[in-house]
């Protein structure tokens, strides 16, 4: 009887009234989410002589919200060597919440022990990041470790071609940048032609003068007569007994045809001297020009004699390229190839400041000729700068010239990477010696990224090997789409996978959000589904209302649980992240950490105060 009355009560009006009233009371008393008490951040990790990087504070792993006792998300030293990529849209806090705080922590390492100070390379495109790095070093007593290359007041001179990098690698890098900046057609001929021309021009100048600049490449590319003269000069320099023709100045002025040959004035005798090539010898004999023939130990025009057997073989290679390849190309096509590189390299000719900083004369690197520093201070080799703990910054904003800034920055990056990788055999041969770490810090990384299966100096190859050289790569870019648009094909995937730690801030494009969601992985999640059905017996249509009615009706409700594999973080979550809020996929050097929410520490706020407290105060 009581059971029947209870079931009857479930379908009466008082039950629905009481149920609704209790639901309202419960909702009002609950007040939405459970409030959290005061947030107690643990002390920041003490500098105990071990290098580590504090990324931010960690609360709930998969949901946004505070807990009373959060933790710090910290990467130990071994995890730093595997690379950190910061990816976030404009205004999401990449620089203020990641790049500045990370640089502060790394450059402050070692304290007063100069042997532990970390040096490296800083690349950026805006022009303000370098000033922040200088301020960081000054605050920690390292003002003398800062080396800046710029176009305004820097005393340093940097020649991107003055190193021991292979000529093909340098040429390929220049050609790749030209094709990526000014058109990436499917026809590989143009990049191959640019690479071949620049490679042999570099070889030619290194053989003759032990020195080459971007301006030298431009002058030889646009002047076929000069190129021919230097090829002949290299042939002559490789002869067993080199000779020169000597004329009196009056004789030189009497024959106009002599002007087409390169002549120098002897500073002592004031006589005219020129390399005695076959063509010059033939001219002198045909026109009965009074001259003398002398053996010489040095070349006119600042060249050097080539005595090394390997270098003589290289001279023959240059000669074969010039006569059997370059001169056989149709003149129109040859002109197109030259124009493809000359319009860009000409910037080093018509801009005096560029020429002064990036194309210094050979005397700049001669301690005797440049004893008074009149040619500027040559930038020391990166291998020396790294071991001294110096921080090199290229302050060349893209606003001045985007393409040129990328070219110079990329060439400097390649030079730095080569110096870093040369540390690997040294470290392996002396494991008992503690070698200092080195930092590669790049803001707006998509402006400097180079990658590709055929690129001998691709970034993905460097990052895959830099761990052994104790290099810490930290880069920031606006989105995965930025890398995708800069690099060809699917090579961006190869590059992205070399960064084991990925910090995702707010993303504003669908592609990047989807890729970030996939990278964070999937997990088995319990999905709830509801099913409602209604049935009636002896159904009829009410004449007054037009609705279906039934004398006996029943409603059935069912609830089902299914296990599905779904993304841990949906793509929309990455678009909804607030400023200084991130989802981090970290790697500690041994094991990958699960993706988690992380609350970053902007450089202008007290890191000892919780993110949510700053948010409550309106600081974020």
Regions found by a protein language model. Name each.
Residues 189-195, 203, 340, 381-383, ...:
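P-loop NTPase motor core of the ASCE superfamily
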Residues 478-482:
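Conserved H-loop
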Residues 41-73:
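N-terminal pre-Walker A segment at the start of P-loop NTPase domains
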Residues 33-35, 60, 66-71, 75-471, ...:
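P-loop NTPase motor domains
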Residues 1-49:
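N-terminal accessory nucleic-acid engagement/regulatory domains that precede
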């Amino acid at each position: 009887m009581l059971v029947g009355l209870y079931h009857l009560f479930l379908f009466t009006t008082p039950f629905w009234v009481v149920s609704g009233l209790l639901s309202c009371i419960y909702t009002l008393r609950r007040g939405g989410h459970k409030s959290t008490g005061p947030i107690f951040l643990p002390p920041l990790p003490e500098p105990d002589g071990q290098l580590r990087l504090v990324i931010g504070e960690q609360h709930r792993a998969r949901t946004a919200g505070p807990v009373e006792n959060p933790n710090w998300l910290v990467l130990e030293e071994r995890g730093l060597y595997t690379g950190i990529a910061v990816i976030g849209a404009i205004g999401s806090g990449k620089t203020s919440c990641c790049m500045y705080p990370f640089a502060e922590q790394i450059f402050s390492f070692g304290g007063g022990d100069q042997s532990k100070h970390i040096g490296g390379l800083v690349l950026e495109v805006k022009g303000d990041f370098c000033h922040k790095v200088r301020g960081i070093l000054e605050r920690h007593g390292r003002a003398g470790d800062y080396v800046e290359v710029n176009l305004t007041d820097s005393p340093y001179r940097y020649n991107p071609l003055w190193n021991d990098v292979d000529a093909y690698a340098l040429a390929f890098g220049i050609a790749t940048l030209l094709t990526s900046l000014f058109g990436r057609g499917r026809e590989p001929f143009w990049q191959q032609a640019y690479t071949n021309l620049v490679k042999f021009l570099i070889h030619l100048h290194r053989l003759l003068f032990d020195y080459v600049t971007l301006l030298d490449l431009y002058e030889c590319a646009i002047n076929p007569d000069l190129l021919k003269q230097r090829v002949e000069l290299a042939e002559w320099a490789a002869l067993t007994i080199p000779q020169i023709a000597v004329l009196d100045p009056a004789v030189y002025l009497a024959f106009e045809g002599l002007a087409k040959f390169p002549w120098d004035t002897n500073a002592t005798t004031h006589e005219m001297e020129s390399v005695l090539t076959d063509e010059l010898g033939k001219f002198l004999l045909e026109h009965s020009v009074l001259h003398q023939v002398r053996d010489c130990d040095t070349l006119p025009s600042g060249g050097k004699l080539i005595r090394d057997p390997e270098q003589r073989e290289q001279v023959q290679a240059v000669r074969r390229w010039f006569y059997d390849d370059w001169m056989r190309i149709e003149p129109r096509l040859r002109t197109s190839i030259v124009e493809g590189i000359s319009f860009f390299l000409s910037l080093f000719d018509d801009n005096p400041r560029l020429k002064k900083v990036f194309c210094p004369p050979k005397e700049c690197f001669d301690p005797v000729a440049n004893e008074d520093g009149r040619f500027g201070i040559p930038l020391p080799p990166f291998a020396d700068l790294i071991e001294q703990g110096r921080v090199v910054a290229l302050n060349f904003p893209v606003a001045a010239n985007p393409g040129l800034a990328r070219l110079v920055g990329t060439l400097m990056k390649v030079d730095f990477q080569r110096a870093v990788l040369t540390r690997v055999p040294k470290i392996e041969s002396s494991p008992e010696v503690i070698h200092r770490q080195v930092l590669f810090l790049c803001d707006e990384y998509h402006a400097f990224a180079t990658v590709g299966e055929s690129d001998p100096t691709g970034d993905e190859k460097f990052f895959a090997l830099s761990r052994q050289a104790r290099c810490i790569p930290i880069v920031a870019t606006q989105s995965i789409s930025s890398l995708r648009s800069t690099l060809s094909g699917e090579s961006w995937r190869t590059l992205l996978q070399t960064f084991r730690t990925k910090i995702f801030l707010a993303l504003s494009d669908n592609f990047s959000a989807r890729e970030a969601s996939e990278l964070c992985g999937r997990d088995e999640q319990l999905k709830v589904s509801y099913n409602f059905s209604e049935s009636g017996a002896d159904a009829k249509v009410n004449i007054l209302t037009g609705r279906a009615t039934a004398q006996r009706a029943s409603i059935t409700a069912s609830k089902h649980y299914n296990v599905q594999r779904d993304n841990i973080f949906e793509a929309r979550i990455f678009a909804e992240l607030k400023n200084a809020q991130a989802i981090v996929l970290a790697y500690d050097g041994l094991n990958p950490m699960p993706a988690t929410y992380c609350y970053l520490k902007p450089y202008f706020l007290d890191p000892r105060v919780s993110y949510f407290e700053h948010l409550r105060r309106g600081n974020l």
